[in-house]
Design a protein with these regions (language model features):
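Short, ordered loop/turn segments at secondary-structure junctions
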Residues: 40, 68, 116, 173
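Two-metal-ion RNase H-like nuclease active-site motif
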Residues: 63-69
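Short, well-ordered coil/turn segments that N-cap beta-strands
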Residues: 1, 31-34, 59-63, 107-110, ...
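Aromatic-lined carbohydrate-recognition surfaces of secreted/lumenal glycan-active proteins
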Residues: 110-121
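Charged catalytic cores and adjacent phosphate/nucleic-acid-binding surfaces used
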Residues: 1-9, 13, 19-26, 46, ...
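Divalent metal-dependent hydrolysis catalytic cores, especially in the metallo-beta-lactamase
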Residues: 4, 8, 24-44, 64, ...
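Alpha-helical transmembrane segments and their immediate juxtamembrane cytosolic regions
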Residues: 52-56
């Protein structure tokens, strides 16, 4: 099963120009079996996803509610952005990553570092958790991302392999053309958030493309 697990729409993410009504059509056209909607700090309500599937006539298509959470330490230091799956509420974007991990794991969900080694456009460092990926109690990380140069791919794969974490490939799409640019191929069917969390924990990934 091929899923793109990092997509933003303009319903809840002001930085995206993807209309919700077009996201599934474009995902289908890209050959995907499913997607995750990961708005900034906001989890799509289940009823809204059900309505979206009904209106588009795509009830058999997999749409998973996740969110992308920006985290900050108690001192206000940016700690990176993280994809959350399996948590029933919107988390916002103000908590420390340690608290987010505690909350999400308490609900049986998973936390995946989003673009941990995405270089900043100016200066040094990363627009992600960077080397903290070696120590945080995360369940996985993005090993392929449109903004990764080759060095970032190598760093992400090194963390994945040495820590035994799940590695996923995501488009981080903010426009229709980006959907499915990168996707994760799962060994078994992933029909909902619970199955996704289980697959991440067991690293049931066949390939990242």
């Amino acid at each position: 099963m091929e899923l793109d697990l990092h997509i933003h729409t303009n319903r809840y993410s002001g930085c995206s120009n993807i209309p919700p009504g077009e996201v599934i059509r474009s995902a289908r056209a890209a050959g995907l079996d499913g997607i995750a909607l990961t708005e900034h700090g906001i989890r799509w309500p289940d009823r809204d996803i059900a309505d979206l599937l009904e209106k588009t006539g795509e009830k058999g298509f997999v749409v998973i509610a996740g969110e992308e959470v920006a985290c900050f330490s108690s001192a206000g230091r940016f700690q990176g952005e993280f994809l959350v799956f399996g948590y029933p509420k919107s988390l916002g974007s103000s908590r420390a990553i340690e608290k987010v991990i505690e909350l999400v794991h308490g609900e049986g969900g998973v936390v995946i570092a989003a673009h941990p080694f995405k270089p900043l456009e100016t200066g040094s460092g990363y627009y992600g958790c960077g080397d903290a990926a070696w120590d945080l109690d995360i369940d996985g990380l993005e090993i392929e991302h449109p903004s990764y140069p080759e060095e970032s791919r190598k760093l992400a794969r090194k963390v994945m392999e040495n820590r035994g974490l799940c590695g996923i490939s995501c488009s981080d799409a903010h426009d229709l053309r980006g959907i499915g640019r990168f996707r994760t191929v799962f060994e078994a069917p992933v029909r909902d958030a619970a199955a996704l969390c289980e697959a991440v924990r067991k690293r049931l990934i066949r390939n990242n493309i």
